[in-house]
């Protein structure tokens, strides 16, 4: 049909989802979808109308508008479809094609009534009218489905639903509103009412055919329902007694006890199992669980106490009987909490809800067993045929009702026996409004689950007969097995905990005595020392195995607790390599870093668990890579495409709770002395506090260890601070060129206790736990691990972990706003409070004492700054020759070097701008330079990868009067292969210099040009003589040692970071945490910028270093050229920023290099040494130190370095008062040997240990550290420790074992803290237990720190130094980990 037909009848109202057509006013007044304004304005022309008509008729589904008429004039209130008829107003071509078989020849659909004129099938008319009424009631569209024969209009039979004879129609009926139509449309014979109108309801309809593939599931459901209906009909009608007999036989033969009651709880049927177990046939009695279940006070209940009770009103008489209790099967006498089963049963009867409980039922032999008792209500309607007997329906399966209703349903089951042959799919399910031959779930209000009222009860013509079908399933064996499993898990955990302690105790003795023996017996031969080393290696391997087993057990029990802290990702990579560097060195394995330092900022995560995974992977690569192989280790930010599935409370922030600071008053009063003993006061506060240096250490959830007698913690004053940021992932990788993994061994690679080669002749050992633990840890950390491998060529392992990326600019702004709200403080605190220092502005240098790569360059001697000449950068010809046969190493080092060149250039330009503008460096901003390969030929520092053009470069530079500034970075393998070529090239340079010198003499020039040429060998060896006394930079090559080497040995970088600008640099660094006003007003800053500062210790080498840069030539200020291939001295030495910064004081306990510290290594070269005694007033010195204590001694004092470029210390806490530092963040006095610890840090020490072996180890350790044996007190239990303190003398430190007889360590600590809350000793827990709960127990009892055995001597020394620092101020340490 065309849209233009019957224009007077077309009145389609358009809303947001329909089309409105209104042709009453104009023939052109048609509309397109969504263009109502154009339609109302009558702007459509005939062409557009025709186009709309064509589109409407081309739609491949039935579509149109129809009106519903109420023939009974009931205002659409009657629900009977016989009182209604509908007329098609407008329909498309598809509608006509689908219904034309029912129409008279030449008759269309539009304008005709469905029943009176078109004679459509009755079931079709009824279905459409009922759904129109539904849409009218709900005031929204309804969806329904119905079947139809392809070739006729007969009513579909259910047998043909899924045959080829049937097509299914999916239809939508949408109520559009009411319209007024002429009365003659309804009654055409009436001519008197031509002007009268009647209301009709207008609907928009669509109908489309659904493919049969979508009904496979419905076909199975229909088949199942048909079978179920057949079974129910046979039971209802009782047509075959044999079937009923067989059915009852099934009930009698199943192992469950089956019973049936009426809606009052009266038993109608019990099967044989019920009778056999309970010994009584309870048919005809009211079900009383109290009489057949266990009773706490009366085990011999009378089972027949209700036998004579046949009154329905008395069905609750026994509800007050003594109720049974739930008892564990493995106990001899039940004593658990009593439960009133009868009350629960009567409640289920009343509310018509499922009854399900575990009940301990007593057999006729007196045995008690656990049964799962389940009962479901079943409703069978009586269809008004009183003569027909109601069958007693009995269910034969335990979970029979689960088929019809889910476990959480509060409804009951109804079987409607209306034999209706027109099943319809309503909302994609086979159903219809109040027409249904399938079971329907109704709620307690007699409503269907779809919200409509159930017609069974609403009509009042049917009576409901409710039956309760129940089963009792014996679960005693399962419950007993579950208890056994739980007990086994507990026993396993206890066994592991006990074995951990028992294995660590002798292992601690082995490692302790061996360590003491190897370090305190100089008369040992080399073979004996090698034997000690072998013992230590075996003990370490055994310790790793014990730790792996413990980790695996904790992972299996989900007891791993992630301890989040703030760290640099590059720190994890470097630490992991450091752990295995000695093993790699033995096999001459090149470990190459692929790290972009300026792209990896601080993150928050579990530092040590991530490092554990990476260490396992590197360890495998070292093990399976042949000698002279290569291992690549790297990290980067992973940009995931799919959101993480890990649960978290926020996606853009983390919430950290900070306890109240009860001890703030102690912080500001102990910062005025510049001695070592109070440089750590900032870390002694037991609770976190916020200051303008950042965040001090706070508590971390379960690590609140100080005893409640120290502080009564008030939860109401806790602060919850939101740290902005986002979650993301880090990608780590370890790539080697080892033996690879064969295909047959890959599937078991991550299995526990397995290797790809598990044969008895396998070449490589190992427990097979490392990768299994790594797999589970990465999953626990929100990531995963995977690998690629090719046999004989190597393997590459990658893993992802989820971390939190703090938003540092936002954090800094929040600190700044908080500082602006604080009141003005006294003058001496201006530096600490004027402006906050952002977290990432505290930059660390690898030249610190914690570094494993240090510069040990003996030819570098410090000069007085005032005597240091200024280098003209424009007069330098600076080249770095990177010579290596390993292209991967060249690419990695080139990236770093180009980054430093770019930073130096930016810094140089910035300094030039400041000098030109005559401004003071009072403010600075930290910039981040992306690490890219800089190939600009105009830059002043260039990188070359061969020496072929060195003669041309040197000759050109010398002829132009420039100074040669060459640094040769030569890998050892390249040196071994091309040493002659390198020597020849440097001899050529020397000859060119000599020729130029002779020409200068002829020209009578007084000043000779001084050149700077250095050789740095990248090697595993420490011997400089092998390489012609060159500087040695030990492999693996790290970021900061290489940077320090370049900055120290190239004049270009020295000219930029010259100590001549030391005052400007310091002022620049301070400006990040000091306002301009405080800089100008603080006398201490003025004194500092006037260079009234002496640095007695420029620490160039650290005692803890493993990798050194060695140069044995001590030539400073020499004016005569030496043999170039042997001489690497520079005539004018300027300090690199990293070296300069190591002398600054800090409150960080990791560094004790202080201004005017008399205990440091003597160094006769001081900065402005002649001004060292200008300030005779100690207060001025103290003020200077006070101000400098706000800065990290390892900071890089230049603005060219981004916060991400130096990441070498242990992971600092995120806003340091939010979280704890977890390990050894205490002063490491590397300027004194371990043997001097007792002399410099004298303490009265008590050892509380019941093991004589451990007492001996502790005694040897302490005497080795310099403590006198006669001053060490030994006790064997906690009570003796308490008695000694109370009756003899107080001690400074107690090394407290956790497990001791009589009184254990935790109990003894608690008593000591109660007795001496403020003057007690510093207690260090020494225990062989390694579980988190053991650590928490120690810390919560009041111990100051916790160390797991075996304890190493250097770690013990660190803790004793910490104790001395605290005891020297007569304070008690209340922090778990400082």
Curated annotation (Swiss-Prot):
> Which residues constitute the signal peptide according to the record?
none
Question: Which portions of this protein are annotated as coiled-coil regions?
Answer: 212-242
The record places domain PAS at: 243-314
Tell me the residues on which 4-aspartylphosphate occurs: 1297
Listed EC numbers: 2.7.13.3
Q: Where in the numbering of this chain does the Histidine kinase domain appear?
A: 498-805
Tell me what this protein is called.
Answer: Hybrid signal transduction histidine kinase H
Organism (species): Dictyostelium discoideum (Social amoeba)
């Amino acid at each position: 049909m065309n849209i233009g037909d019957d224009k007077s009848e077309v009145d389609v109202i358009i809303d947001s989802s329909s089309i409105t057509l209104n042709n009453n006013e104009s023939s052109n007044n048609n509309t397109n979808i969504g263009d109502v304004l154009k339609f109302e304005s009558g702007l459509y022309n005939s062409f557009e109308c025709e186009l709309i008509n064509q589109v409407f008729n081309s739609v491949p589904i039935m579509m149109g508008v129809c009106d519903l008429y109420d023939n009974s004039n009931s205002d659409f209130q009657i629900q009977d479809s016989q009182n209604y008829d509908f007329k098609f107003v407008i329909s498309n071509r598809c509608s006509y094609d689908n219904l034309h078989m029912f129409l008279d020849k030449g008759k269309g659909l539009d304008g005709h009534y469905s029943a009176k004129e078109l004679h459509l099938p009755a079931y079709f008319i009824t279905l459409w009218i009922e759904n129109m009424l539904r849409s009218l009631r709900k005031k929204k569209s309804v969806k329904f489905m119905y079947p139809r024969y392809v070739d006729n209009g007969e009513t579909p039979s259910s047998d043909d639903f899924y045959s080829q004879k049937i097509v299914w129609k999916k239809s939508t009926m949408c109520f559009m509103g009411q319209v007024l139509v002429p009365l003659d449309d309804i009654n055409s014979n009436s001519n008197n009412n031509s002007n009268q109108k009647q209301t009709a309801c207008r609907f928009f309809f669509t109908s489309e055919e659904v493919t049969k593939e979508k009904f496979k599931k419905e076909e199975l459901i229909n088949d199942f329902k048909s079978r179920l209906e057949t079974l129910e009909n046979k039971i209802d009608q009782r047509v075959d007694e044999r079937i009923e007999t067989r059915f009852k036989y099934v009930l009698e033969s199943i192992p469950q006890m089956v019973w049936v009651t009426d809606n009052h709880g009266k038993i109608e049927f019990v099967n044989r199992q019920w009778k056999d177990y309970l010994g009584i046939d309870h048919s005809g009695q009211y079900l009383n669980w109290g009489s057949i279940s266990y009773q706490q006070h009366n085990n011999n209940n009378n089972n027949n106490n209700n036998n004579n009770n046949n009154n329905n009103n008395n069905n609750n008489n026994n509800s007050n009987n003594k109720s049974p209790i739930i008892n564990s099967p493995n106990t001899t006498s039940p004593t658990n909490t009593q439960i009133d089963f009868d009350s629960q049963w009567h409640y289920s009867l009343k509310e018509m809800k499922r009854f399900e409980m575990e009940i301990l039922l007593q057999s006729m032999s007196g045995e008690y067993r656990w049964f799962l008792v389940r009962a479901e209500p079943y409703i069978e309607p009586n269809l008004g045929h009183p003569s027909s007997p109601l069958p007693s329906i009995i269910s034969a399966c335990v979970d029979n009702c689960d088929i019809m209703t889910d476990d959480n349903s509060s409804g009951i089951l109804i079987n409607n026996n209306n034999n209706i042959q027109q099943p319809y799919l309503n909302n994609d399910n086979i159903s219809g409004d109040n027409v249904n031959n399938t079971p329907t779930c109704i709620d307690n209000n007699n409503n269907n689950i779809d919200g409509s009222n159930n017609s069974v009860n609403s009509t009042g013509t049917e009576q409901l007969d409710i039956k309760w079908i129940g089963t009792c399933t014996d679960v005693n064996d399962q419950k007993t097995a579950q208890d056994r499993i739980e007990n086994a898990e507990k026993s396993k955990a206890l066994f592991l905990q006990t074995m951990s302690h028992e294995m660590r105790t002798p292992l601690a003795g082995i490692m302790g005595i061996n360590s003491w023996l190897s370090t305190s017996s100089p008369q040992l031969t080399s073979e004996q020392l090698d034997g000690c080393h072998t013992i230590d290696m075996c003990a370490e391997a055994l310790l790793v195995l014990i730790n792996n087993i413990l980790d695996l057990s904790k992972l299996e029990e989900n007891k791993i607790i992630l301890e989040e802290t703030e760290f640099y990702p590059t720190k994890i990579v470097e630490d992991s390599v450091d752990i295995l560097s000695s093993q790699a060195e033995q096999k001459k394995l090149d470990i190459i870093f692929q790290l972009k330092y300026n792209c990896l900022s601080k993150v928050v995560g579990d530092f040590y668990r991530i490092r554990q995974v990476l260490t396992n992977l590197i360890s495998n690569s070292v093990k399976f890579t042949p000698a002279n192989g290569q291992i690549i280790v790297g990290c980067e930010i992973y940009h995931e495409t799919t959101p993480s599935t890990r649960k978290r409370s926020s996606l853009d922030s983390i919430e950290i709770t900070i306890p109240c600071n009860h001890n703030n008053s102690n912080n500001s009063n102990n910062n005025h002395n510049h001695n070592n003993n109070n440089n750590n006061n900032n870390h002694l506060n037991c609770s976190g506090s916020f200051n303008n240096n950042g965040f001090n250490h706070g508590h971390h959830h379960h690590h609140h260890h100080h005893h409640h007698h120290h502080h009564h913690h008030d939860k109401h004053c806790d602060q919850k601070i939101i740290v902005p940021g986002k979650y993301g992932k880090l990608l780590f990788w370890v790539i080697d060129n080892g033996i690879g993994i064969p295909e047959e061994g890959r599937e078991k690679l991550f299995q526990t206790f397995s290797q790809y080669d598990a044969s008895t002749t396998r070449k490589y050992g190992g427990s097979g736990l490392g990768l299994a633990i790594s797999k589970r840890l990465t999953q626990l950390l929100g990531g995963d691990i995977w690998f690629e491998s090719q046999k004989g060529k190597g393997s590459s392992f990658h893993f992802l972990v989820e971390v939190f990326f703090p938003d540092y600019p936002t954090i800094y702004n929040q600190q700044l706003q908080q500082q602006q709200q604080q009141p003005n403080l006294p003058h001496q605190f201006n530096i600490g409070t004027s402006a906050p220092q952002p977290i990432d502005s505290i930059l660390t240098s690898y030249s610190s004492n914690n570094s494993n790569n240090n510069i040990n360059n003996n030819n570098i001697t410090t000069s007085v700054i005032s005597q240091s000449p200024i280098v003209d950068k424009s007069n330098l010809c600076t080249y770095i020759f990177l010579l290596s046969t390993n292209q991967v190493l060249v690419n990695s080092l080139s990236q770093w070097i180009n980054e430093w060149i770019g930073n130096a250039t930016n810094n140089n330009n910035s300094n030039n701008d400041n000098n030109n503008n005559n401004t003071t460096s009072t403010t600075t901003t930290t910039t981040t330079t992306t690490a890219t390969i800089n190939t600009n030929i105009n830059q002043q520092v260039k990188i070359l990868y061969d020496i072929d053009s060195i003669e041309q470069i040197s000759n050109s530079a010398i002829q132009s009067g420039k100074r040669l500034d060459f640094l040769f970075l030569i890998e050892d393998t390249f040196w071994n292969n091309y040493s002659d070529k390198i020597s020849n090239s440097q001899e050529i340079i020397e000859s060119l210099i000599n020729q130029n010198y002779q020409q200068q003499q002829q020209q009578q020039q007084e000043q000779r040009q001084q050149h700077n040429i250095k050789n740095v060998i990248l090697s595993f060896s420490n011997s400089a003589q092998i390489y012609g006394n060159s500087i040695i930079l030990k492999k693996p090559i790290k970021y900061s040692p290489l940077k320090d080497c370049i900055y120290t040995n190239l004049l270009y970088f020295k000219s930029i970071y010259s100590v001549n600008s030391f005052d400007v640099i310091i002022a620049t660094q301070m400006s990040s945490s000091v306002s301009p006003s405080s800089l100008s007003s603080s006398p201490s800053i003025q004194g500092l910028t006037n260079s009234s500062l002496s640095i007695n210790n420029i620490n160039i080498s650290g005692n803890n270093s493993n990798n050194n840069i060695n140069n044995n030539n001590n030539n400073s200020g020499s004016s005569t050229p030496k043999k170039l291939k042997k001489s690497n001295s520079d005539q004018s030495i300027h300090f690199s920023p990293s070296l300069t910064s190591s002398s600054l004081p800090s409150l960080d306990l990791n560094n004790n290099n202080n201004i005017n510290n008399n205990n440091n290594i003597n160094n006769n070269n001081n900065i402005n040494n002649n001004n060292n005694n200008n300030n005779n007033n100690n207060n001025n010195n103290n003020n200077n130190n006070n101000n400098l204590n706000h800065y990290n001694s390892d900071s890089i004092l230049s603005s060219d370095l981004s916060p991400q470029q130096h990441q070498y210390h242990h992971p600092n806490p995120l806003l340091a008062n939010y979280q704890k530092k977890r390990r050894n963040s205490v002063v490491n006095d590397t300027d004194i040997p371990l043997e001097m610890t007792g002399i410099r840090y004298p303490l009265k020490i008590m050892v509380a240990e019941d093991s004589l072996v451990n007492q001996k180890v502790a005694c040897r350790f302490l005497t080795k550290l310099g403590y006198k044996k006669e001053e060490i007190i030994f006790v064997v239990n906690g009570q003796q420790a308490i008695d000694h303190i109370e009756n003899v003398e107080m001690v400074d430190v107690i090394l407290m074992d956790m497990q001791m007889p009589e009184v254990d360590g935790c109990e003894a600590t608690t008593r000591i803290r109660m007795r001496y809350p403020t003057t007690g000793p510093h207690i260090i827990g020494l225990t062989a237990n390694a579980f988190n709960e053991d650590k928490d127990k120690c810390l919560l009892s009041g111990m100051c720190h916790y160390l797991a055995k075996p304890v190493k001597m250097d770690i013990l020394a660190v803790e004793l130094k910490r104790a001395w620092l605290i005891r020297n101020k007569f304070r008690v340490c209340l922090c778990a980990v400082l």
